[in-house]
Amino acid sequence: MSIFNNVKLKLSLGLGILLFGMSSIFGFQVSGENFDANFKISSWTATKNGSVITSEGIVGEGYGKVYLTHTFSSNNPEGSSGDFVGQARTINKDGEMRFASLQGIWKREGSIVNMYTLDAIDNGVMNYAKGKVDLFAGTLNFEVYPID
């Protein structure tokens, strides 16, 4: 093997490793079984340190009517990103009620807030959800991914 071929091989190998590493860093994607959860904002309250948004909607997967409360805190003066905590209550037609804790991060771009949340339900079910809040339209739309 000539020196030229050896350098070419090492360069190709290094470039391949670099591209694979970059795709791992910049290619975070969630996939798998999921369901939609759509809500209407019922109130939006300003606080000294952020906002509290309550919402409600009908969600499949046995959840039924779902009520959410999210307390948002900003990590910058522009109010363009931060974290949140929240609670959920669900009631289905059979009268089965569930409670959940919600926590995650958010980033606002104009009137749209992108949310990334991890939810723990009182029956042991855990979900990851990503969604969009349209502050002008008053809607929250999530893709929910059950965590095994």
Features from the language model and the residues they span:
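Secondary-structure boundary elements
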Residues: M1-F4, S24-F26
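Bacterial N-terminal signal peptides that target proteins for export
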Residues: S2-G14
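Bacterial N-terminal signal peptides
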Residues: S12-S24
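Beta-strand-enriched cores of mature, soluble protein domains
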Residues: I25-D148
